[in-house]
Amino acid sequence: LMTILTIVSRITGFIRTWAMAAAIGMSLLSSSYQVANNLPNMLYELVMGGMLVTAFLPVYMGVRREQGREASNEYVGNLLGILLLVLGGISLLGTVFAPGFIWTQSFLSGDGDSMDTAAFMFRFFAIQILFYGLGSVFSGVLNAHRDYFWSTFAPVLNNVIVIASFMGFAPVSAQFGERAGIILIAAGTTLGVFVQMACQIPALGKHGVHPHIHIDFKDPALRQTIALGIPTLLATVCMFVSTSITNAAALVVQPETGPSVIAYARLWYTLPYALIAASLSTALYTEFSHDAQEKDYDSVR
């Protein structure tokens, strides 16, 4: 099921790319969109993404096994509260200081004004940092309960919304001007990420997950999460720096189309991983985490 849904997601992802290419092509607007739209996910990964992906699932399963449903719900509620505080704060800073955030992706370019549109769109996109964090926790909880449908199908809904936004770009721009069209695709892209996150919430209740959102920095489960996740920080920092330099260099080599070329090419070379490895690794990591908590190391091997 996961592989099938992943294929559907990739198909809609290709359609999304075609819709984007048809709407804004290979242009400065396209590059601005790519830079601004990729940055929220990069920042989420840098601040908490790697830690959540690596550490949340085994810690959650351990708490639920050893302390019960109520304790695991408290752990989830505490983590959500911290995400709202930290990622919400970063999202607010990104909205207010958008040009500075965009500079991290264009610092090699001598033309600072070339990314004005990217900064404008990033003001719409910054809240995605929070949405990605919340969605990651929701997906982790559902995966822990072997419920892979919504976490795998959610990107399809995201793609459909973004496709509709790009399809509306030309008529809206013709009727109300290009700035209105830019607002449409910026708002539509953020709406897609919100729906991708929010559509998973109803499924949580089916598994008895009703977290009480609060903040407790003394929670032992939180400390365990941080301890397990810290080693991934180096990898996420390296990835952020590498991607930032790549985008900045691309804007020097091809000032208007560099980031767009990279984005279109990346879609193809990540395809094998997205179709096969992603779904397998998601399911296997859940089983590995379960077996490790049960100390069934023979099954892990």
Regions from the PLM with identified roles:
Residues 1-301:
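Membrane-embedded alpha-helical bundles of multi-pass transporters/translocases
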